[in-house]
Amino acid sequence: MNPRRKKRLTLAVALVFGLGATIGLMLYALSQNMDLFYTPTELVQGKPDGTKPEVGQRLRIGGMVVEGSVKRDPQSLIVTFEVADVGPAVTITYNGILPDLFREGQGIVAQGVLVNSTTIEAHEVLAKHDEEYMPPEIAEAMKKTHEPLQYSDEQKQGRVQ
């Protein structure tokens, strides 16, 4: 093989290797930043296709805060509460200041890590905007079960107990 062809071959191999490494790193970064959305029922029972998240997986969960479930640690900012849709409840632990619109009986979306099959350690909690707002993922999940949410008059008025 003459030197000119050898140089071209080396350059082509280096280019293909570099391009492959770049694409591999991009796919790895995207997979690390992907958070899958679950409802409490899907988290406990699994999605219709049979998939369930693994312990340690990052995810988003949305539902309604169960009334009487909010417990605050008086010594720190740690808050523990339960979120449910139409099925089982999931416990969420959050260390931080909750949004002003957060209250029992209202919709939230939490982003965090699955600690065990029914507990999530959240690093972000988002509250809904008003008494009629529901995140699209939660509304779609509720439609699938054909069970509409029943709001109390106090929830519709936005009063805190």
Curated annotation (Swiss-Prot):
Keywords carried by this UniProt record: Cell inner membrane, Cell membrane, Cytochrome c-type biogenesis, Heme, Iron, Membrane, Metal-binding, Signal-anchor, Transmembrane, Transmembrane helix
Periplasmic side: 30-161
Origin: domain of life: Bacteria
Membrane topology label: Single-pass type II membrane protein
Residue spans, topological domain Cytoplasmic: 1-8
Gene Ontology annotations for the cellular component aspect, listed alphabetically: plasma membrane
One GO biological process term: cytochrome complex assembly
Residues engaged in binding heme: 129, 133
Transmembrane segments: 9-29
Compartmental location: Cell inner membrane
InterPro entries tied to this protein: CcmE, CcmE-like_sf, NA-bd_OB-fold
Any one GO molecular function term: heme binding
The protein's role, per its UniProt record: Heme chaperone required for the biogenesis of c-type cytochromes. Transiently binds heme delivered by CcmC and transfers the heme to apo-cytochromes in a process facilitated by CcmF and CcmH.
Database matches in HAMAP family: CcmE (MF_01959)
Family: Belongs to the CcmE/CycJ family.
PANTHER family: CYTOCHROME C-TYPE BIOGENESIS PROTEIN CCME HOMOLOG, MITOCHONDRIAL (PTHR34128:SF2)
Protein name: Cytochrome c-type biogenesis protein CcmE
Organism listed in the record: Photobacterium profundum (strain SS9)
Gene name per UniProt: ccmE
